[in-house]
């Protein structure tokens, strides 16, 4: 079973590409996060705070529950 951070990062990358078609840099700037910090989340290397999860979900136009749906299945 993959680490939860890796599974979440994979889901986040997929959603970013599907919902925004923006690069990591452009999306991070849009939601007011540092690009390297955001990249490390997508790569499963960092934990993320609730405040930043809210920024990410808003930037993707989805709810927090949608952000976490199906992570266990990946």
UniProtKB/Swiss-Prot annotation:
One Pfam family, short name: HTH_3
- One GO term of the cellular component aspect? cytosol
Q: Which domain of life is it from?
A: Bacteria
What ranges are recorded for DNA binding? 23-42
Q: Which GO terms describe its biological process?
A: DNA restriction-modification system
Residues in domain HTH cro/C1-type? 12-67
Q: Sorted alphabetically, which keywords does the UniProt record give?
A: DNA-binding, Restriction system, Transcription, Transcription regulation
The record's section on InterPro entries has: Bact_TransReg_Diox, Cro/C1-type_HTH, Lambda_DNA-bd_dom_sf
Recall the GO molecular function terms of this protein's record.
DNA binding; DNA-binding transcription factor activity
Q: Does the keyword Translocase apply?
A: no
| Function description | Probably controls expression of its associated restriction-modification system MunI.
Q: What is this protein called?
A: Control protein C.MunI
What is the organism of origin for this protein? Mycoplasma sp
- In the UniProt record, the gene name given for this protein reads munIC
